[in-house]
């Protein structure tokens, strides 16, 4: 008798049974937020048009492409995880180093500014030059148009609300 097919069937049955097990209940007060539906392209374009100049004429596709340089350390979705860097949802209008569940550098904690597009522009140009002692290892984005596009993408993707 051949054991190969029997072992394969037993393994498959075990995997299927494991997938069907109920998950432990989420502790009260820590229910994950339901993910908001991603805006349509038309909604993104409307949000873009409502941004202050020069961001209202930015190239969102290029901004999203430039964010690929950031996404190994940052997320943008509401309720998204902190990674090596903090989640960026709601970053505009927020005091620097103010997320309670992320350990910022002493330099950024002492900075005391509010994140606005102009601060972010200087920050992503050369983070270590703009604020020596911060923990961000990104070398920077030299092209001003790329920075404008990236900032516009972040404004559209992170819940920007004009101040």
Which role fits each region the language model picked out?
Residues 1-17:
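Sec-dependent bacterial lipoprotein signal peptides
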Residues 12, 69, 94, 126, ...:
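Residues within well-ordered alpha-helical secondary structure of globular protein domains
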Residues 19-22:
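Bacterial signal peptide processing site
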Residues 32-66:
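Electrostatic cytochrome c docking/interface patches
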Residues 60-64, 78-116, 138:
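Gly/Gly-Pro-rich "capping" loops immediately C-terminal to redox-active cysteine motifs
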Residues 63, 67-76, 150-154:
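The canonical Cys-X-X-Cys-His
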Residues 69, 84, 132-134:
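Envelope-exposed proteins and targeting segments
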Residues 116-163:
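C-terminal capping alpha-helices of c-type cytochrome domains
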């Amino acid at each position: 008798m051949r054991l190969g097919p029997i072992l394969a069937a037993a393994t498959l049955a075990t995997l299927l049974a494991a997938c069907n097990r109920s998950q432990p209940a989420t502790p009260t007060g820590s229910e994950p937020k339901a993910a908001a539906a991603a805006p349509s392209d038309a909604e993104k374009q409307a949000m873009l048009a409502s941004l202050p100049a020069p961001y209202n004429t930015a190239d969102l596709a290029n901004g999203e492409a430039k964010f690929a340089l950031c996404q190994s350390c940052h997320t943008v979705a509401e309720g998204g995880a902190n990674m090596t860097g903090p989640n960026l949802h709601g970053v505009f209008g927020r005091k620097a180093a103010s997320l309670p569940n992320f350990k910022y550098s002493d330099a950024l904690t002492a900075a005391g500014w509010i994140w606005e597009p102009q601060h972010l522009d200087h920050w992503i140009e050369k983070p270590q030059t703009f604020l020596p002692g911060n923990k961000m290892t990104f070398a920077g984005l030299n092209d001003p148009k790329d920075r404008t596009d990236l900032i516009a993408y972040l404004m559209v993707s992170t819940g920007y609300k004009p101040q």
